[in-house]
């Protein structure tokens, strides 16, 4: 028996393609943005454990905000009445990927915020960001994971210091290029 989608999946899993893991495990040691209200995060609490007479299995609960750790943002996070993840549906959650690499600029300035000019430089090299794209920001900030202090960029005065997106850049990708989502390696945009 053969199905076209299985064939496509088989091809995608072949040596012709490289799969890159971009996620981190979530647990109570996972770093997250310090502005999240107290009590909003509870990761990996065991609600059923082995030996429970009612249900012989292990079940964990996870409670956390949608913008937690490194994450994906949809237009509604920045654009009032913008699209949320629910808008897209499962069949649309595969997007063309565009990666704006600003690692060199971040190495010079920890507070660097990607600009419209950075995006236009990307487009001059690779072509326009396609409609419905996932636009990711590469800063190499993920190399600070899993240290809460390092990934937060916490200074001696308690301030958080890390790179991110500028609002004009976000408006450009969402309003001018109709991006579906954006991503970044830091705990906040």
Feature locations, PLM:
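Active-/binding-site microenvironments in catalytic and ligand-binding cores
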Residues: 1-189
């Amino acid at each position: 028996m053969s199905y076209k989608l299985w064939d496509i999946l088989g091809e995608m899993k072949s040596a012709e393609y490289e799969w890159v893991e971009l996620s981190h495990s979530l647990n109570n040691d996972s770093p997250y943005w310090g502005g999240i209200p107290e009590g909003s995060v509870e990761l990996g609490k065991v609600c059923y454990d082995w030996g429970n007479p009612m249900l012989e299995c292990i079940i964990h609960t996870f409670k956390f905000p949608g913008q937690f750790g490194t994450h994906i943002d949809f237009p509604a996070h920045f654009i009032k009445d913008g699209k949320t993840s629910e808008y897209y549906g499962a069949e649309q959650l595969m997007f063309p990927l565009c990666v704006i690499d600003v690692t060199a600029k971040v190495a010079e300035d920890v507070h660097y915020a990607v600009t419209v000019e950075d995006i236009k430089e990307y487009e001059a090299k690779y072509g326009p960001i396609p409609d419905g794209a996932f636009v990711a920001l590469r800063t190499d900030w993920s190399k600070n994971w899993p240290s809460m202090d390092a990934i937060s960029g916490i200074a001696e005065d308690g301030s958080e210091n890390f790179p991110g997106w500028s609002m004009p850049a976000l408006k450009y990708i969402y309003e001018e290029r109709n991006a579906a989502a954006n991503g970044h390696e830091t705990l906040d945009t």
